[in-house]
């Protein structure tokens, strides 16, 4: 609350530490505090470069932000959301297929909306499809039998109705027969989960996290999960083992006679 003007040359580590303590007292998130440090350090570097004012913050490291564990839904909840979608009309069948596919493949929302019909060329014979990830990197992923069946039904019963005689390569279409947008996929997830009585804030990434967590819980090798998720580095995938480790720890303390 005591505001005091500080000249750029006076910005030192003691002042920055006091500022961080003040932010923590105000319950500012660690990620925001880390960003503030980076901004101030860059400002000090700019003053040094442009005005010849030596930076006293060169070696000041931003606080380490604890890794947020991804939110995964229980299998029963995923099943409840997917199974609650009626497939009696073209939109319902499309929505159900989108949910099936997000959970079956762990696709990112950007990969899902960019899917083209030709990316399914091996669906019948090999039960796989092509996804194009970050940097347009192609990967082939297996499609589970329920998602596969839903896709086949969608291609026969729903997509032609949505296309309304137009020509189009996009796999998933909106009600005007155009490529579906990310916003509509978000909306589908929000509305369909609310209808199933799941009132948590869900996103397409929730399905991706659930996909990875359930695979690792089921004993899948981390390298396989890395490949399926399209992670360039296995360390990105290792966060899912932390989720599982939490469950292991919980079970241990609940079950071991001398640990309770």
Which residues make up each language-model segment?
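Conserved catalytic core of the tyrosine transesterase superfamily
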Residues: 1-260
